[in-house]
Amino acid sequence: MADSLELVIDTIMAREVLDSRGNPTVEAEVLLEGGAIGRSIVPSGASTGAHEAHELRDGGKRYLGKGVLQAVNHIEENIAPALCGLSSLDQATVDSVMKQLDDTDNKSNLGANSILAVSMATARAAANGLGLPLYRYLGGPMSSLLPVPLMNVINGGEHAANNLDFQEFMLVPHGAESFREALRMGAEVFHTLKDLLSQKGLSTAVGDEGGFAPNLESNKAAGDLLMQAIEQAGFKPGEQVSLALDVASTEFYAEGQYCYGGNSYSSEQMVEELAGLVNAFPIVSIEDGLAEDDWDGWRLLTKKLGKNVQLVGDDLFVTNTLRLQRGIDENIANSILIKVNQIGSLTETLEAIELASRSSYTTVISHRSGETEDTTIADLSVATKSGQIKTGSLSRSERVAKYNQLLRIEDELGSQATYAGLVGLGPRGSLKG
């Protein structure tokens, strides 16, 4: 066991690096007195919720305004002096000090990207200082649940330059016996889907998250393709591999109407559209089926589908306990997407997960469309026993890095490892069995 003095924060450094879209992002390194180092890189999103914590960008001509040197400077000039001398084991204090330094509701002074980079790097430094893997440090000795991956194999919306309005069409290989088998199942369907697209003369170019980005007639056509790919790969739709959607409906919502596919829908009509898709396909999860501030629409959707389908709030909740508590109080949605950079610190992320768990809401640990080689969310999914992870398709190294880390964790756990399977989707998952 490391001496407590060895776990004190000695030095904090930061630099500007690139994410998977070639845009700048923040990397932080935390060095402890005993020599242990933690490094973390923050992601960024394309379809960002209006209520997310503020991502600080430089503006100006450099990197077309997307530079993050201000955030880097905040880390080295403001955050580092305040944190050096604190114990890396006291994550809550570290994050609280940064939050107080910023002194805004949305972290707009220092930037959520600067605060989060240091927050995650501190946790990793502490884990390294103790000689523990990150999932074990954050979750304790009982953390052994491997998540079901929600694999985004057809990209649309803000994640691709095609005509699909819905943002993500995902595979859910819940019928596997292990995470390793689930990954194999997803990969086999992914490659079968590529062959199908080629046979139909459709594009096999990939979008931001590594899924294919073909032009298709409709959202239903994407569902038909996935069903065909699942069957041709030798799996049973609904029994072994189901589907999930990220509608990202805020992106096409304006003046009380949902406008896509050449049509305009009221909230009530949008709910019926989604119900029709659920009846047509084995859909176990729908993310952001309604817009981020259409609370009345969300109420209708939850009443209509909430007993049988996981209804995930992403833009709706933005990993924020205040918005999640409103959803809980008003019986809206039944699941929350967890994105560390939406709220901007590890402590607040864990608080959101804890609130969801206490309230019988499922959690889905998620990447962003602008990702990096950082694998923190893989460890976080195991540490928190979330049971579900979204980290893209079966291509692009920044996506596959998280899958590979989960493979390592599963191997390390050995016989202790449990694959979440359908149970990972909570009560609604069991209804699908």
From Swiss-Prot:
Origin superkingdom: Bacteria
GO BP of this protein: glycolytic process
The protein's required cofactors: Mg(2+)
UniProt keywords, alphabetically: Cytoplasm, Glycolysis, Lyase, Magnesium, Metal-binding, Secreted
GO annotation, cellular component aspect: cell surface; extracellular region; phosphopyruvate hydratase complex
Annotated binding of Mg(2+), by residue: 246, 287, 314
Note on how the cofactor is bound: Binds a second Mg(2+) ion via substrate during catalysis.
CDD domains: enolase (cd03313)
GO molecular function terms attached to this record: magnesium ion binding; phosphopyruvate hydratase activity
The keyword Secreted is annotated on this UniProt entry: yes
Pathway field: Carbohydrate degradation; glycolysis; pyruvate from D-glyceraldehyde 3-phosphate: step 4/5
Binding site for (2R)-2-phosphoglycerate: 167, 339, 368-369, 390
Catalytic activity: (2R)-2-phosphoglycerate = phosphoenolpyruvate + H2O
Subcellular location: Cytoplasm; Secreted; Cell surface
UniProt xrefs under InterPro entries: Enolase, Enolase-like_C_sf, Enolase-like_N, Enolase_C, Enolase_CS, Enolase_N
Active site as annotated: 209, 339
Family per similarity comment: Belongs to the enolase family.
Protein name: Enolase
Lineage: Bacteria, Bacillati, Cyanobacteriota, Cyanophyceae, Synechococcales
